[in-house]
Amino acid sequence: MAVDNFLFGQCILYFLAFLFGFIAVVPLSENGDDFQGKCLLFTEGIWQNENMTMGKQRFIVEEWGPESSCRFITFVGIVSLILSAVQAWRTFFFLCKGHDDSLFHSFLNLLLSLLVLFVVFVAGTISSVGFSIWCDSVTENGAMPSSCEDLQDTDLELGVENSSFYDQFAIAQFGLWSAWLCWLGLTVLAFLKVYHNHRQQELLESLVQEKELLLGHPLQRSSYVYNRNAMI
């Protein structure tokens, strides 16, 4: 029953991690297309007066953020999506067949969960911090009358499609951090499963030793009686 509970919990969390990974990857891919491969994470710029008489301002990008940042978080989202899908199918198969991982495979699963947990945390942090820097830059640290969300409805004249950037990264961050919570739960379950399997193995070894001791005493007594009769 305990094994079935572990497998059922893992199956549900893997499915949720797959779902949230999908939620993160789709808007990130759309943003990459809208910005023509340019990355708005960590992008900095300033507002300048384009027309002094009319007082019209235009946002000038001083330096676009590193493309590797956007590529990394998209890659992590895809990896999380694929791994969770494979693991969900594998766990569901074990649940239906009544199989269970060995102690060694449970330990490998724990290491994999820890690795993915760390990588998704890094991706979520990059997404949150990088997008915060972009919003601070485009709103001049809150000095602009419009918020970062409102500015997506304004044509920033950057040669890119910026009509959905806030919604895209808000959804992507939600997907990444939700996926991280799922992997956190999976890591805890993987640790508990390793501990459970280790305790079971110790119990099995203890039972084997007790059986050997119980079988060994009668054999020793029979050998003693046989030797005594032979001497007589």
From Swiss-Prot:
It comes from the Eukaryota. Keywords: Glycoprotein, Membrane, Transmembrane, Transmembrane helix. The keyword Transcription does not apply. It is a multi-pass membrane protein. The chain crosses the membrane at residues 6-26, 75-95, 114-134, 169-189. The keyword Membrane applies. It is found in: Membrane. Glycans are attached at residues 51, 162. GO terms for cellular component: membrane. Signal peptide: none annotated. Belongs to the TMEM179 family. This is Transmembrane protein 179. The lineage of its organism: Eukaryota, Metazoa, Chordata, Craniata, Vertebrata. The gene is tmem179.
